[in-house]
């Protein structure tokens, strides 16, 4: 889960990372009141989970509370790269002397963590990495020790901080690691990390991504979800403990096991090239418990996507036998009733496959077509989706 800037700021503050005052506002009046409370120069910042706010006009400096009101009025409701601005953060103005960059993230390729740091912050890090890679220090971080004092000193030294700043910057970096570790984050980024005119080191703009798989031990994270920006289908799937990701195609996909589902997406995409370019509409892994309720919930999510024209159910029976899956499909269609209106292509293989096929054949549901192989099923589902278009 990606956080808004104000949420990242609040997490930073909770872990002792030095930040400036910031108050979230959802109306121009709230923005004015926040600016009056903070006092002095403030910055009105659109709260969206996408970059490029400044270029889009979503970040404005306000010298007075009245200016903050006018800026908030202009920014609220703005569309920034497809994201509607529902709230702004009124941030205390900073006397910036220098801008730096710091982030810590998962390094999946090397199965560790990676800290990245530069004395050249404030710009897009991708641009810096491409144009001047030598200006971006990359330091592996051990999962056993994390960013301790020694590692923090190594980071600031490799980044090229002057000797007189290293202790202060290293201290902030250790606190940012605490955010990363204690909050089960997959990314903590500060751009810019700044030195103010009086020599203080502050985290001015933060980005945090949290690991959804750690929600069971992070009770406070549920309150950070903004339901206004959640995809309703993904929210419904999550509520039913389904692993679902919406894509932009026309063939709904249900499978058991992430590996099988990903393979199914590839096969559907390949088959779609022969049928008008149709593509997979989603990733949906029902796991090992493909009973009637789970199957009904899965179908309910997929059939709620208006883009879906057909559904391909691809199941390999293992612990959950194919006859149980078949019974689940039949009962799921009974549960959904008139809500089930799109054709289903079902491919079963593995444990109790013959019994599973027999159950579906005897049910003789008009929406269900049996396929002997994954390739055959993907081709038929793609054909049906193309025909429906």
From Swiss-Prot:
Task: List the pathway annotation.
Answer: Carbohydrate metabolism; tricarboxylic acid cycle; succinate from succinyl-CoA (ligase route): step 1/1
Ranges for domain ATP-grasp come to 9-236
What does this gene product do?
Succinyl-CoA synthetase functions in the citric acid cycle (TCA), coupling the hydrolysis of succinyl-CoA to the synthesis of either ATP or GTP and thus represents the only step of substrate-level phosphorylation in the TCA. The beta subunit provides nucleotide specificity of the enzyme and binds the substrate succinate, while the binding sites for coenzyme A and phosphate are found in the alpha subunit.
Reactions this protein catalyses: succinate + ATP + CoA = succinyl-CoA + ADP + phosphate; GTP + succinate + CoA = succinyl-CoA + GDP + phosphate
Q: What is this protein called?
A: Succinate--CoA ligase [ADP-forming] subunit beta
Residues where substrate binds: 256, 318-320
> Looking at the keywords, is Cell cycle present?
no
Instruction: Paste the cofactor note.
Output: Binds 1 Mg(2+) ion per subunit.
HAMAP family cross-referenced by the UniProt entry: Succ_CoA_beta
Extract the Gene3D superfamilies matched here. ATP-grasp fold, A domain (3.30.1490.20), ATP-grasp fold, B domain (3.30.470.20), Succinyl-CoA synthetase domains (3.40.50.261)
Per the record, the GO terms for biological process are: succinyl-CoA metabolic process; tricarboxylic acid cycle
State its cofactor: Mg(2+)
Q: What quaternary structure, including any partners, is listed in this protein's UniProt entry?
A: Heterotetramer of two alpha and two beta subunits.
Where along this sequence does the record place binding of ATP? 45, 52-54, 94, 99
What Gene Ontology terms describe what this protein does at the molecular function level? ATP binding; magnesium ion binding; succinate-CoA ligase (ADP-forming) activity; succinate-CoA ligase (GDP-forming) activity
Cellular component (GO) terms are: cytosol; succinate-CoA ligase complex
Family the entry assigns: Belongs to the succinate/malate CoA ligase beta subunit family.
The scientific name of the source species is Micrococcus luteus (strain ATCC 4698 / DSM 20030 / JCM 1464 / CCM 169 / CCUG 5858 / IAM 1056 / NBRC 3333 / NCIMB 9278 / NCTC 2665 / VKM Ac-2230)
Which sites bind Mg(2+)?
191, 205
Claim: ATP-binding is one of the keywords in the record: yes
EC nos: 6.2.1.5
